[in-house]
Amino acid sequence: MIIGVPSEVKNNEFRVGLTPDSVQVIVSHGHTVFVQAEAGLSIGYTNDLYIKAGATILQSAAQIYSEAELIIKVKEPIESEYQYLRNDLTLFTYLHLAGDPEKAKKLISTGVRAIAYETVTSADGSMPLLAPMSAIAGQISIVVGSYHLLKHNSGKGVLIGSFGDISPRVVTVIGGGVAGTEAITKATENNAFVKVIDLSQNKLDELKLQFGNENMEYILSSPENIKDAISVSDLVIGAVYVVGKEAPKIVTLEMLKNMKPGTVMVDISIDQGGCFESSRPTTHDNPTFLVDEVLHYCVTNMPGAVPLTATQALNKVTLPY
């Protein structure tokens, strides 16, 4: 098979579909790999490293797409890439089409065979190709949330941890899946008081066994419970995911009116349409906006902020496929 790895073109997206180590494994099985020039340069993967691994370097995306039978990417194609898609090409990447039906229609119109990382499901119901990026996004959500709580970022001007007799700040995590669990882990490491909200009592019980009771509160999801929790929170993490579907809008515009000015909301679910009614996609260049004095962070490719870690983690799980 002829495999192509184009450069990512989404805003501040520095991940790459294959590492040189992955290329070496694929080539050893008799396949041909074309990599676009400097596709991995920003994370230290030079053209020479790919050549030594057995890849051939091509200069343009047009060349990569025209030569390949299988395209391996990280993020969904953007408008400028649709021209390269065709009915005898297979695309293997994150697509997150549930929140963007127009993009789904455009992909269908090209005839391309598209396989979404995030919907590949194991026999046990887990999503092995989504999990590592969800975990990274969960950790990043606390990092960027804490940063945007700083006063010069329009936040409250607080640190989420406790200091001596100063009570810890409140972090609410909505959704107890992979991303939510990692966000909880990071928040507890920073000595925050964490409120966890989930639809499943069984999931809440599992999380309680994992994290205990100290500085933790476990809340069964309902509109009233969500409203009450976020009204006293300093940082709210939205980590809701429904396989292949648009994220439900669980925090309404009306709820924002009860929140304190400078509260930060991080919507990890934004690549599935967002789980806050007030959310809209943002970029690493311009990541935040205010609604009712509540700061929203809605970057659609959060793991792109740590591209080397994310690329290595992604390749570890995608290579077997």
Ranges and model annotations:
Residues 12-17, 80-84, 93, 243-251, ...:
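Glycine/threonine-rich flexible loop motifs
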Residues 118-159, 270, 275-321:
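Adenosine-phosphate binding glycine-rich loop
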